[in-house]
A protein has these predicted regions:
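C-terminal structural segment of proteins
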Residues: 1-154
Length: 154
């Protein structure tokens, strides 16, 4: 049996601030991927669908881990897992339809790792959390090297 593998160099960074993450992504001349739960990125890498030059793990960024009620609205970061949202009783009461969609994401094990932000960003037509977010008039706050913008789900 003949087995051959080609390894390419990949950097992994785990910044602690949003500005640091944006700086890393903005400075990368190759392919950069954001890593929150990893359930999509790792599968895509395993299947050789993507070969990132840089992985930026955002789980250490406080803003990406928050679930916050503010002025009658709720905000949760891109690194919040489905399980973490399910474990937040106040969010469950405020947004039962959104939580119905979150509960449809994968298995119990997947929800413990997968993020709702990743479910949205993956842009899969089968993303379970997207229809309830559209119905709830959710707005994504997208941040990158060119600043922040608010993007309605609808």
């Amino acid at each position: 049996m003949n087995c051959e593998a080609t390894l390419t160099e990949m950097r992994y960074e785990a910044p602690e601030t949003l500005d640091a993450a944006i700086g890393l992504i903005g400075a990368e001349t190759g392919v950069a991927k954001v890593f929150a739960g990893g359930t999509d990125v790792l599968v895509q890498m395993h299947l050789d669908l993507i070969e990132p030059d840089l992985i930026v793990d955002v789980k250490n960024i406080a803003e990406m881990r928050e679930v916050v009620e503010q002025d009658g609205s709720w905000r949760f970061g891109a690194a919040v897992t489905g399980k973490e949202l399910m474990d937040n009783p106040e969010f469950n009461v405020a947004w039962p339809g959104v939580m119905d969609g979150v509960r449809l994401i994968g298995s119990v094990q997947v929800r413990g790792r997968a993020t709702v932000g990743g479910n949205l960003c993956n842009a899969s037509p089968a993303a379970d959390s997207v229809p309830p977010m559209i119905a709830a008039d959710a707005i994504a706050s997208v941040v990158g090297p060119n600043g922040r913008r608010e993007v309605p789900m609808a």
